[in-house]
UniProtKB/Swiss-Prot annotation:
Mg(2+) 2 binds at residues 221, 223. Mg(2+) 1 binds at residues 179, 221. It comes from the Archaea. This is DNA primase DnaG. RNA polymerase that catalyzes the synthesis of short RNA molecules used as primers for DNA polymerase during DNA replication. Also part of the exosome, which is a complex involved in RNA degradation. Acts as a poly(A)-binding protein that enhances the interaction between heteromeric, adenine-rich transcripts and the exosome.
Amino acid sequence: MVKDEITTTKYLIHSQINAKGFVEKPDVVGAIFGQTEGLLSDSLDLRELQKTGRIGRIKVDMTNRSGRTKGEIIIPSSLDRIETTILAASLETINRVGPCEANLRVTKIEDVRAVKRRTIVERAKELYQNMMEEFTPESSRMIDEVKESIRRPEIIEYGEDNLPAGPNTPTSDAILIVEGRSDVLNLLKYGIKNTIAVEGVNVPKTVADLTKKRTVTAFLDGDRGGDLILKELLQIGDIDYVTRAPRGLEVEYLDKDQVIYALKNKTSVDKITSHANYNHNQHRYHNKPKSHDKFESKLHEVTSSVNKTDKYSQKNESKQFKQQKNENKQVKDNSKEKTQKSTEKHNETEETHLNKYELMLKELSGTGKGRLYDMDFNLLKEVKVSDIYNEVKNSKETIKNIVFDGIITQRIVDLSKEKNIECLVAVKMSEVVKKPETIKIITK
């Protein structure tokens, strides 16, 4: 394709000609003009179109071999698409060139503007590449520096072992134990800042000490390394919950949904006896709980002791002692009956409170408001849900119960613990990781 054709035309008609004999270029050009003359309307007459410059110079490239002639014909066109295709189709009516039989076939119609666009894109790529190599984008470097300065303080070094940890680890009541620094970084991306890494299979003393003071969840990889760390934690630590990444995955590569799912489905250590039977997908252990084994052991000791005492009694007790024993039994039965009544009364009170909470929440439904109550459920104040946090934080009154038409968040729970609030009642609860045992949380 010649450069001036690209700049002066819209389309190029490419066609192939085969002639049974020896023919030359002038024969082909003459056949094109001669056999298409009068075939189409005057507006599409080739001679007229060439005079007005709407058709360019016809180019023919011929080869003669074994008494036959083959060649390629290129006709530049500045007509529109429809006129160009009609003109191209008319070329296929040519059946003779000079004295020889021939046939002509249009192979393609090339859009010169598309070629220009491709040329522009390729050249733009070259220019951009050169620019990137020659000039360092200052603004990009500035952005990276600012991001790095923000990111760097997020991870702290905690304890005498200088372990990687989230910024809230020193003050948080609940912490997450993970395997490495990358896990801490990944959880920081999703706003989880109460993490600490053990940095290997051997659990450091810093982490072992922390497990005795805080509510601890072990969030470990779903691989062999996670199994080993869990075994170590169960032996030397005092963890409360365990959760795992899906089998074969690591915490550092989990997305936000996977992290939230794992934390929601954590398993209490009380239900665990052997980490080897831990199922990564269901987050549960299949053997009997530890606490049950301990309970059975203690029960066996007590039973043995009682049996020994009974044998001794049977040998030595007199009628008077038997009478005393019957009196003691009666006292015991009376005590048991009182305890049972007390339990029933407590359950009734609990049920009454639940009904009261439901009624209060129903009254607030759709209002977007909340109510603050004291110990005896006397209304202290009614406020908008958006103002509850500030009202509770700044209040000098003794608030014990909060009922509101909204969502319980970690922020509200933390403030309630700080203010010694006993009960939170709301429509639903968001992703709350730390739930203090001193606060009763009720949702719709």
